[in-house]
From Swiss-Prot:
The keyword Protein transport does not apply. This is FMN-dependent NADH:quinone oxidoreductase 2. HAMAP family: Azoreductase_type1. It comes from Pseudomonas fluorescens (strain ATCC BAA-477 / NRRL B-23932 / Pf-5). It catalyses: 2 a quinone + NADH + H(+) = 2 a 1,4-benzosemiquinone + NAD(+); N,N-dimethyl-1,4-phenylenediamine + anthranilate + 2 NAD(+) = 2-(4-dimethylaminophenyl)diazenylbenzoate + 2 NADH + 2 H(+). Keywords: Flavoprotein, FMN, NAD, Oxidoreductase. GO terms for molecular function: electron transfer activity; FMN binding; oxidoreductase activity, acting on NAD(P)H as acceptor; oxidoreductase activity, acting on NAD(P)H, quinone or similar compound as acceptor. The lineage of its organism: Bacteria, Pseudomonadati, Pseudomonadota, Gammaproteobacteria, Pseudomonadales. Its cofactor is FMN.
Amino acid sequence: MSRVLIIESSARQQDSVSRQLTQTFIQQWQAAHPGDSITVRDLARNPVPHLDANLLGGWMKPAEQRSAAEQDSLQRSNELTEELLAADVLVMAAPMYNFAIPSTLKAWLDHVLRAGVTFKYTDTGPQGLLTGKRAYVLTARGGIYAGSTADHQEPYLRQVMGFIGIHDVEFIHAEGLNLGGDFHEKGLNQANAKLAQVA
């Protein structure tokens, strides 16, 4: 049995395309892997705090030297990190906001990219510790950006996933959603066709 962790980050709810893609993924994954467990963390409904001095301080101190506020911040970060460590498959649903990812998703990443936990420093440079995991990134984009210099979403997420040792990453883009005509339908159809091959 595998554990699947899904990270939702769209600020929209019912009309969110990235959430639609997530639901399609869940339906197809459950049909193909009925014994797997799926955990969904919704960063829009339950936002993760941005990094602050308490969390940064807590990371740098031994347990006995942490203040109550530092310990509280660290406990939240530990919960997020433990979810990721326990997962075999990571799914990130990310609409493109201003050529990049939602700030809620960036905040989550800031909590789980942790030295000594998800990566470590070595004499030859950083080494990711989450090898053996798979990741899928489901994106929704108003325009068509794949392969262009305006895409600061896929390159960034590939970089951070690789940094923590997740190199098996597949991106599924629903593009051109706001371009009018039949672009919206084509973008969804292409994304759904790729999703059908995932499970």
